[in-house]
């Protein structure tokens, strides 16, 4: 018996000396390796009884565990909370709920769930996304706004049951709000904009796309009161008229991004107001605003010298008389979408090539008057910058276009759908020289001669087609 005890004591002493030696060596190694060695020593030197009593939540301090939980997303936190009582307390700690995204649970989220979450988060919550949660009502938002006054980022995209009442509570309690997405909240009106404008002066981003009930007055209130607003997204706001910015030009100096896609009532007067007021403008989308003419482009060329992205797809009244002065005045343009601007010719492309040296992406789809000559000029002037070129449905372009584009070093994608005079052989040759460039093209299958179909007696016409 004494011998066994002496052997056990000797083994324990040897183990202790070995552990000490490892610890000394660890000081000379990389910190990560040292940490792993110390961890392995801790695990391997525990007796079975000690292992049973040394769960992770007992070995690691609460502060460390909380830090680990802070890296988990909403779904992982919910799952972790079901492991044990200790983990439930840690997972549901308010400090882990500074950013909450319920998009994954959009179909299941009810008002009661959101209210409970608001009570749990309290003053910790800074970012909340209820994107697509169509079952959420004003009552849930009332709880959130009153209990989470430090909210800075809120997305209510497609929360169609949310009304002006929610915006009233946002203005009353959430004075730190700087990002608000109300896209497709179709019940929102100008009253909501009054509440937001009065109570959220730090707002820098607002998206009220497809909110049909919002009219000029609502947008004007926001621009007048929110001096830090630099991004305004108004896609599909059909209630806006050409005078929406007429009385607030002086309040648009901070605007850098403005999206007016499919605001059908806007005219050259609107663009003139934008150009006069939003002198810091870098991004403008007016696609499908089909009442604007060359006068709009002249105004932008005269005042919007910081413009980098301009989207004008579907603006069919625009032509060379507008784009040429635009190119001369907006020399920082990086992306320009002119799809369906079918009145432009090589003169526009040449002006862009000569003046807009930073141009990276250009869409010329359905610009049927442009030829190989202007593409050659564009390619020679933008060998180092051009990334994307969309040329689908440009019937005058030929194989020469690909020959010119072969030397554009930065090119990543070319669209050539329905360019009848560009051959398969030219595309194959291009891909051989530039295999890393995506080429999107389509060639209709050859229709079989009629006499071949007639000679197939006994086979129905459907089978011949198939």
Swiss-Prot record:
Alphabetic keyword roster: Cell projection, Leucine-rich repeat, Repeat, Ubl conjugation pathway
GO CC term (a single one): perikaryon
Function: Substrate-recognition component of the SCF (SKP1-CUL1-F-box protein)-type E3 ubiquitin ligase complex. Plays a role in regulating the entry into the dauer state. In hermaphrodites, may play a role in modulating the rate of defecation.
Domain of life of the organism encoding this protein: Eukaryota
Disruption phenotype: RNAi-mediated knockdown reduces the rate of dauer formation following treatment with daumone, a pheromone which induces the dauer state. RNAi-mediated knockdown results in a 10-20% increase in the average time interval between defecations in hermaphrodites.
Tissue expression pattern: Expressed in neuroglial cells such as the socket cell and sheath cell, neurosecretory motor neurons and regions around the pharynx and anus.
One GO process term, biological-process aspect: dauer entry
Compartment annotation: Perikaryon; Cell projection, Dendrite; Cell projection, Cilium; Cell projection, Axon
Protein name in the entry: F-box/LRR-repeat protein fbxl-1
SMART domains for the chain: FBOX (SM00256), LRR_CC (SM00367)
Subunit structure: Component of the SCF (SKP1-CUL1-F-box protein)-type E3 ubiquitin ligase complex.
Domain F-box: 54-100
Main location: other
LRR repeats: 122-147, 148-173, 174-199, 200-225, 226-251, 252-277, 278-303, 304-329, 330-355, 356-381, 408-433
CDD domains: F-box_FBXL2-like
InterPro entries cross-referenced by the UniProt entry: F-box_dom, Leu-rich_rpt, Leu-rich_rpt_Cys-con_subtyp, LRR_dom_sf
């Amino acid at each position: 018996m004494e011998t066994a005890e002496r052997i056990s004591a000797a083994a324990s002493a040897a183990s202790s000396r070995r552990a000490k030696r490892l610890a000394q060596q660890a000081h000379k190694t990389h910190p990560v390796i040292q940490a792993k060695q110390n961890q392995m020593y801790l695990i391997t030197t525990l007796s079975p009884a000690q292992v049973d009593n040394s769960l992770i939540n007992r070995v690691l301090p609460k502060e460390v565990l909380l830090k680990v939980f802070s890296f988990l997303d909403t779904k992982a936190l919910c799952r972790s909370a079901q492991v044990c009582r200790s983990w439930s307390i840690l997972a549901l700690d308010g400090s882990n709920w500074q950013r909450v995204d319920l998009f994954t649970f959009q179909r299941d989220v009810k008002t009661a769930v959101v209210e409970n979450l608001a009570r749990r988060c309290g003053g910790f919550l800074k970012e909340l996304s209820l994107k697509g949660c169509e079952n959420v009502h004003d009552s849930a938002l009332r709880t959130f706004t009153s209990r989470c006054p430090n909210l800075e980022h809120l997305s209510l995209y497609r929360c169609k049951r949310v009304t002006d009442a929610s915006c009233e509570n946002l203005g009353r309690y959430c004075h730190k709000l700087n990002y608000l997405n109300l896209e497709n909240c179709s019940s929102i009106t100008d009253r909501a904009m009054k509440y937001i404008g009065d109570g959220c002066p730090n707002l820098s981003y607002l998206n009220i796309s497809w909110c049909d009930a919002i009219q000029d007055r609502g947008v004007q209130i926001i621009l007048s009161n929110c001096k830090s607003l630099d991004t305004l997204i108004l896609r599909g706001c059909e209630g806006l008229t050409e005078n929406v910015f007429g009385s607030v030009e002086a309040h648009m100096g901070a605007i850098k991004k403005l999206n007016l896609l499919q605001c059908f009532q806007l005219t050259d007067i609107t663009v003139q107001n934008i150009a006069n007021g939003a002198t810091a403008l870098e991004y403008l989308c007016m696609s499908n605003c089909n009442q604007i003419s060359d006068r709009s482009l002249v105004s932008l060329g005269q005042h919007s010298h910081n413009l980098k992205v301009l989207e004008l797809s579907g603006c069919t009244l625009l032509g060379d008389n507008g784009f040429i002065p635009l190119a001369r005045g907006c020399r920082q343009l990086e992306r320009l979408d002119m799809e369906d601007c079918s009145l432009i010719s090589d003169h526009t492309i040449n002006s862009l090539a000569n003046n807009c040296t930073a141009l990276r992406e250009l869409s010329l789809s359905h610009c049927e008057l442009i030829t190989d000559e202007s593409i050659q000029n564009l390619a020679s002037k933008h060998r180092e910058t051009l990334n994307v070129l969309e040329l689908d449905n440009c019937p005058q372009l030929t194989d020469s276009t690909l020959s010119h584009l072969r030397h554009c070093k930065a090119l990543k994608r070319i669209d050539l759908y329905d360019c009848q005079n560009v051959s398969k052989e030219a595309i194959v040759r291009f891909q051989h020289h530039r295999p890393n460039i995506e080429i999107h093209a389509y060639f209709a299958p050859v229709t079989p001669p009629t006499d071949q179909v007639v000679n197939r007696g006994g086979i129905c016409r459907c089978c011949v087609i198939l």
